[in-house]
A protein has these predicted regions:
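Short amphipathic coiled-coil heptad-repeat segments
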Residues: 37-79, 233-262
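Basic, amphipathic alpha-helical recognition segments used for DNA target recognition
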Residues: 1-22, 82-85, 148, 153-211
Length: 262
């Protein structure tokens, strides 16, 4: 149907000759209203997600800086070097000849491509394990884009694009997310944006001395993350439902029952 030599397109005449399944006007209005209602739900969910994210950002600003203290906690916070409070493992890439997609060995986390929605994902495995991270560790990107933070829920081999950080609770995980932008300042000026083990270990962190206070703060923020994730999941399901409805309603596969009144 396309015409032309180098630049292809559909002519006005051919466009007019395309046959489309068209219902009566009442059914058209009913279909349009049904899809508009779903669009309204998606928009409402998007607004709710944005609101929850803004609330979480404000909460992080209050709780992770000590500006707002939780009831029952009054001990002064202290400044510590990251290297003094956490176990840090810098990644080392195995030889590519050991990479595989058959899940032989351990999953391989090499960089940002292996991180999605703050979680490590499995794209490939390696039968040669150089440096290892463990279920629950924090994953920090050390190459551009520098400083992206995630967690892993499985043991893995880590390549040179990331480091693994072990800390006994999720306070540090949330703190590093809160301070993500700091890493880009450290990497400025280098030929290839990256941070090294010394820069990571020397990062100063102000945190509660009381581990219970750390855990309570982490729980509050993790609960907010769970609420946001639930809304995002519901929104994704609604968007998928709309696609299915369009496939059914706009092709005539499924017909709506339209009242006889105008």
């Amino acid at each position: 149907m396309a015409t032309g030599l180098k630049v292809y397109g559909i002519s006005k005449k051919n466009l007019k000759n395309i046959l489309l399944p068209v219902p009566g006007k009442k059914e058209q209005r009913a279909i349009a209203q049904t899809l508009s209602d779903v669009d309204g739900l998606i928009a409402a969910l998007d607004r709710a997600i944005a609101k929850k994210r803004n609330i979480k950002t404000a909460t992080m600003q209050e709780l992770l800086t000590g500006k707002k203290r939780l009831p029952g906690f009054g001990e002064e916070w202290q400044v510590k070097r990251l290297g003094d409070i956490a176990n840090i493992t810098m990644g080392q890439s195995p030889s590519s000849q050991y990479y595989n997609s058959e899940e032989i060995g351990l999953p391989l986390i090499q960089g940002n491509a292996d991180i999605k929605n703050r979680r490590a994902v499995i794209r490939k495995s390696t039968s040669e394990v150089t440096k290892k991270c463990y279920d629950g560790d924090i994953i920090l990107s050390v190459r551009a884009p520098v400083g992206e933070v995630a967690k892993t829920n499985f043991d893995a081999c880590i390549g040179r694009g990331v480091s693994a950080i072990f800390y006994p609770n999720d306070f540090l995980y949330h703190y590093l997310i809160f301070r993500e932008g700091r890493w880009s300042k450290l990497s400025k000026g280098s030929t290839f944006d990256s941070i090294n083990s010394t820069e990571i270990k020397d990062l100063e962190i102000k945190l509660p001395v009381d581990l219970i206070e750390q855990r309570v703060i982490a729980t509050i923020l993790s609960d907010m993350d769970a609420e946001i994730a639930a809304l995002e999941k519901r929104c994704a399901k609604t968007q998928a439902m709309k696609q299915g409805m369009m496939q059914e309603l706009l092709t005539g596969k499924t017909r709506l029952i339209v009242p006889n009144h105008p």
